[in-house]
C-alpha cells in the first residue's frame, strides 16, 4: 500500500524541482539580456498562470526586447495593472515605439511615482 504512494510523490517532487530550475534559468537569462532564450520559458509560464503579474512582465519584456512590440503590450499592460513597477517602464517604451506618446508619458510618470513610493532611486527614469 505504501509503495503505491511513493512513486507519485517522487514524481511530484522532481516536477516541482524542474519547474523551479526552469524559472530560475529563465530569470538568469533575462538578467543577462538573453531575452530570446528566456522568452519561450516565460511564454509557457504565462500560459500556465495567466494572472501572474511577474510572468506577464517577464514575457512582455522579452517580446519587447526581441522586437515584438504589439505582442508585448497586452502582457505589459496586465503587469502594470498589477503594479509591477518595471512593467510601467517597459509599457512606456513600447507605447513610445508605437507612437502612442500620451500613453507612454503617462506610464513613465506612473513608473516614477511607484519608484518614489517604494523609496527607490528615480534619477535614471527622470532623464
Task: Set out the residue ranges of the language-model regions.
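Short coil turns that delineate tetratricopeptide repeat
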Residues: 50, 82-84, 116
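Canonical tetratricopeptide repeat
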Residues: 58, 90, 124-127
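Alpha-helical segment of the N-proximal tetratricopeptide repeat
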Residues: 21-44, 48
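Register position in tetratricopeptide repeats
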Residues: 31-32, 65-66, 97
Amino acid at each position: 500500500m505504501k509503495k503505491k504512494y511513493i512513486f507519485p510523490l517522487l514524481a511530484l517532487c522532481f516536477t516541482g524541482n524542474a519547474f523551479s530550475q526552469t524559472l530560475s534559468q529563465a530569470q538568469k537569462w533575462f538578467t543577462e539580456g538573453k531575452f530570446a532564450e528566456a522568452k519561450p520559458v516565460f511564454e509557457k509560464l504565462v500560459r500556465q498562470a495567466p494572472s501572474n503579474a511577474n510572468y506577464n512582465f517577464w514575457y512582455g519584456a522579452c517580446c519587447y526586447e526581441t522586437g515584438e512590440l504589439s505582442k508585448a503590450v497586452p502582457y505589459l499592460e496586465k503587469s502594470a495593472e498589477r503594479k509591477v513597477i518595471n512593467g510601467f517602464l517597459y509599457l512606456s517604451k513600447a507605447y513610445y515605439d508605437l507612437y502612442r506618446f500620451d500613453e507612454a508619458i503617462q506610464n513613465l510618470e506612473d513608473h516614477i511615482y511607484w519608484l518614489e513610493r517604494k523609496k527607490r532611486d528615480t534619477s535614471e527614469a527622470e532623464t
